[in-house]
């Protein structure tokens, strides 16, 4: 007889858990962006493109200086090189923070 009572209690508990689960708000998809707004992925892509452009400009300026093109100063070459270096370091730090945030989220208990 006690098995019947335990079974009924188990069924009541399961129904209560089901009702609790049904009353929880549903997970929603990412909100739609308003017109004119860009997503984080777009901003990151633009930043990567800008770093690439900075590095290309630095390389072109250095090559022009090496072949002795007139109007190219060593100071301009060094400044362009440092700009490219700093932008790459900043992008690397952003990448490191993204990886760390991803790892933190993945280690969260569910």
From Swiss-Prot:
Domain of life, per the record? Bacteria
Q: Name one Pfam family in it.
A: FliE
- Enumerate the NCBIfam families for this protein: fliE
According to the UniProt entry, its GO molecular function terms are: cytoskeletal motor activity; structural molecule activity
The name on file for this protein is Flagellar hook-basal body complex protein FliE
What GO CC terms are in its UniProt record? bacterial-type flagellum basal body
- Asked if Iron-sulfur is a keyword of the record, the answer is no
Protein's GO biological process: bacterial-type flagellum-dependent cell motility
UniProt entry tagged with the keyword Acyltransferase? no
Instruction: Write the record's keywords in alphabetical order, separated by commas.
Output: Bacterial flagellum
Q: Which family does it belong to?
A: Belongs to the FliE family.
Q: InterPro entries of this UniProt entry?
A: FliE
Location in or out of the cell: Bacterial flagellum basal body
């Amino acid at each position: 007889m006690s098995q019947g009572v335990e079974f009924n209690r188990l069924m009541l508990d399961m129904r209560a858990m089901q009702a609790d689960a049904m009353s929880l708000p549903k997970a929603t998809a990412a909100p739609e962006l308003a017109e004119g707004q860009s997503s984080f992925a777009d901003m990151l892509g633009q930043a990567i493109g800008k770093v690439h452009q900075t590095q290309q400009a630095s390389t072109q300026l250095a090559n022009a200086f090496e072949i002795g093109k007139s109007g190219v100063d060593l100071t301009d070459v060094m400044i362009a090189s440092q700009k490219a270096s700093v932008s790459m370091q900043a992008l690397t730090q952003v990448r490191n923070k993204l990886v760390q945030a991803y790892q933190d989220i993945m280690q969260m208990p569910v």
